[in-house]
Amino acid sequence: MRSITAILSVFVLLLVCFSASGAAVENTNPVLNFEVISSDWAPFALPVYGDVRQGETDYYTYYVPSGATTLEVSLTWDVSNGDALRLLVHPPTGASSSFGDGMDGTINGKIAVRTSIPVTMTASNWRFDVIGLTVDDVTSYTLKINSY
């Protein structure tokens, strides 16, 4: 029993330390609490395909309908050549939230987040920025946005 408790204690300590290390998530919006998701859970979203170069930003607008309570966003790309992208989420009011690869504990070319939507932020446009942080020439990506 002691060994199981010790193993669990070490696991929790590592989880807390790993979660605190690195600034992959910068949520400056006190109203929205984003949850990191480790699977590609957005099969019903119509994907948006794009290409981005180093220092370039692609902008997307998404209308969140009235009555929606949840927002899910997924950004995926190929990291085999070391390309790094960043996702910025701009709600209709308040500060934006910034997300980078590795939030789920793995550098895998995937940023996937979910948040509850306050009723005051529905029936409005949200903006999503895909930023080429470190890109060798050009990298292709897929962006999926769902609200329900």
For each feature predicted by the language model, list its residue ranges:
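Non-catalytic extracellular/lumenal accessory regions of secreted precursors
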Residues: 22-70, 146-148
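Intrinsically disordered, low-complexity segments enriched in Ser/Pro/Gly/Ala and basic residues
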Residues: 2, 8, 18-20, 37-38, ...
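Noncatalytic accessory or regulatory domains flanking protease catalytic cores in secreted, cell-surface
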Residues: 86-148
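Acidic, Ser/Thr/Pro-rich low-complexity intrinsically disordered segments
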Residues: 51-102, 122-124
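Serine/proline-rich low-complexity intrinsically disordered segments, especially terminal tails, linkers
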Residues: 5, 11, 21-23, 40, ...
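Secretory targeting signatures
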Residues: 1-28, 128
